[in-house]
Amino acid sequence: MKTFMAKPQDIKNRKWYVLDAEGKVLGRLAAEAARILRGKHKPDFTPHVDTGDHVIVINAEKVVLTGKKLRDKKYIRHSGYPGGLKVMNYEKLMKTRPELAVEKAIVGMLPHNRLGSRMAKKLKVYRGPEHPHQAQKPEPWQAL
């Protein structure tokens, strides 16, 4: 018996799933979303092929960080210029751009290569409960 390996041209029907982030812990939500984006929930999962589905995360502003992470956890970026380090704690980040905090958590759990970049393009994060993807007929994800 041979192990099944999916080929990129075999992946036809990708589904769209909606994850509601309201009241969910950021890391647990990110792990579940990354699992769907990679395709690990499917029986035809192949590590070197993008077999995953599309993920829409709504209510990103209502995601929860446990403990003192809201105050202590930092979002760090650098412009590339001397003295260009920008540091912001998650409390301020969640007030200004909560969709960025959720997106960074999910993308950080994907492979850090070209395959992971393609998977990240299937992720859509929205601050509130509305999203413009009704035409794709997304299904709610219940595994959380």
Curated annotation (Swiss-Prot):
Keywords (A to Z) from UniProt: Ribonucleoprotein, Ribosomal protein
Signal sequence, start to end = none
The record's listing under Pfam families reads:
Ribosomal_L13
A Gene Ontology biological process annotation? negative regulation of translation
InterPro entries the UniProt entry points to = Ribosomal_uL13, Ribosomal_uL13_bac-type, Ribosomal_uL13_sf
Q: Does the keyword Ribonucleoprotein apply?
A: yes
Q: Which family does it belong to?
A: Belongs to the universal ribosomal protein uL13 family.
Q: What does this protein do?
A: This protein is one of the early assembly proteins of the 50S ribosomal subunit, although it is not seen to bind rRNA by itself. It is important during the early stages of 50S assembly.
Query: What is the name of the protein in this document?
Result: Large ribosomal subunit protein uL13
Originating organism: Pelotomaculum thermopropionicum (strain DSM 13744 / JCM 10971 / SI)
Q: What is the lineage of its organism?
A: Bacteria, Bacillati, Bacillota, Clostridia, Eubacteriales
